[in-house]
Amino acid sequence: MSFNVNWNSLETDSLRSWTVELLTEALNSGKRPNILASDITIKDLNFGKIAPRFEILEIGELDRDRFRGIFKIDYNGDFHLTLHTKVQANPLKIYSDNSLEKEISASSPFVTPDFLLSSDAFNIPLDLKLSDIKISGIGIIVFSKSKGLTMVFRNDPLDSIKVSSTFDTVQVLATFLQNQIENQIRDLFRETLPTLLHKVSLKYTSSNNTNDIIDNLKDHLSNNVYSNALESLEVENVSPGNLQKLAKIYSSRETLKLNVPKLKRIVQRNHLEKFNKNLNPNLASCLYTNMGLQEYSGFSGVSSSYNSIPVGLIANEDFKKVDEILQEISSIQSKNFKSGSNDHKPAKRRTIKLGKGMRQKKVDMQNVDESTLNSINMSRCATEYCDTLSDVSTVLSDDQHNHIEQPTPLKVFTDTRPPLRNVVYTEGYKCSSPMNSNSSFVGSVGLGNNFFQIASGCAPSASPLRNDLSGQKSVHSHDVKVKVKKSMNRIDVSQINEKLNGGFNNGTSKEAMHNENKAFSHNDPSITPFELPPPPYHQLSRA
């Protein structure tokens, strides 16, 4: 759906005068910048002969008192607008108008230079013409009989605009004005035009007269939107003296003097390095200042890099204050260490741990005694292990659990057969009697041979209960009574030896027995206690 707009009906004096008045009030609203020497006036306004093209793309809601739709507008006509104002061409005049020289001229006479004609106005007239406007945009229109017309653009409708001014000969100024005016017109379509159309629509939708609509529109446009935010702030608890000091500080930054006046309790930026040095004085001065002590004569005039501990202060002060002085020194050193850099690490303190060597020694001993079977169980528990090889119980303590060291794997060999016991021989009487167990007559394999430990009264046994489990000395065989099944052909040599020993001991003394044994060992036939055995068969003479 499209419409043909009767554009010639807009060429009326009443509409033109009302539009000029409305735009003049809008352009001069708010605080005027110092670069402008006069107000902005509209010199020429012409709507042109070419009407814009208006097309409705969609109608969302249609009623007697309500309408909502999407439209498209295209304009490439001959509309033009000419503005007139005066521009301040003296930069020193602009600088003096922006400064606070008038408020502080009494205290600071030389804030800005006072050359001849330096602060006089130099106004240049400026004519600004806007023409060749090209618009192409899509917007949304919402019309209500009670609320008027509302229009919002979905995109930036401004395609191009031509800006002509008095300064077109200066290319830099021409480019600057072109960019600034394009940005302002885009803001006009985005914010100002919807508000303006809404106010105009109320003229036809309400019973109020035109003057009331214009007055309401003037009140809306006369609001100081671009006013300084500091003007709306309420200054509280600021005396006139403080305001004068603040103005003096502000003016000191604008002066052309080589010697900037110094102000009390104020740090200048060029003196900031000296101020930072005073923030970190030496240890002695900080100590005297914090504790309220009189300065020691030995440390007067010491440089700020000297941070040694004042031993003279500790020696001269009372013994009761020495502890407080040492605590203050520690706090000052900690603050200086932390303020040195953000990547600081906590200071290391000397600590002494007692009993660490003993605990480490116990852990090492337990690790040596552990086997690979104990190293598998890593849980916090107590384990006892007993074997035929050792009766040592291994207990995993809390210290071992916290710091576990894997021992070297040990090869465990378990003998399935218990070791042989030491052979115990019964000491008999030294004689070559065939009745003796050591005689050659019973030396062969058979009964009475000491190899089977039968003659000594000790039967062979493979039971592990008789082994020495505690590592003590082995028990002698004659102290252990073992019941041995006796054979019918067995000769009890021990009883015979006891009888022989008893017979010798009853009739003779120890010396006689010693002599007899000696004679017997030398084969003395005179003192032979009993008959000698016959010689072996290989020693007999052959007949």
Swiss-Prot record:
Localization of this protein: Mitochondrion outer membrane
Keyword annotations: Lipid transport, Lipid-binding, Membrane, Mitochondrion, Mitochondrion outer membrane, Transmembrane, Transmembrane beta strand, Transport
Tagged with keyword Transmembrane: yes
CDD domains: SMP_Mdm34 (cd21673)
Region (Disordered): 519-543
Primary location: mitochondrion
HAMAP family in the record: Mdm34 (MF_03105)
Domain notes: Lacks alpha-helical transmembrane segments, suggesting that it resides in the membrane via beta-sheet conformations similar to those predicted for other outer membrane proteins and porin.
Function: Component of the ERMES/MDM complex, which serves as a molecular tether to connect the endoplasmic reticulum (ER) and mitochondria. Components of this complex are involved in the control of mitochondrial shape and protein biogenesis, and function in nonvesicular lipid trafficking between the ER and mitochondria. MDM34 is required for the interaction of the ER-resident membrane protein MMM1 and the outer mitochondrial membrane-resident beta-barrel protein MDM10.
Protein name per Swiss-Prot or TrEMBL: Mitochondrial distribution and morphology protein 34
Source organism (scientific name): Clavispora lusitaniae (strain ATCC 42720) (Yeast)
UniProt gene name: MDM34
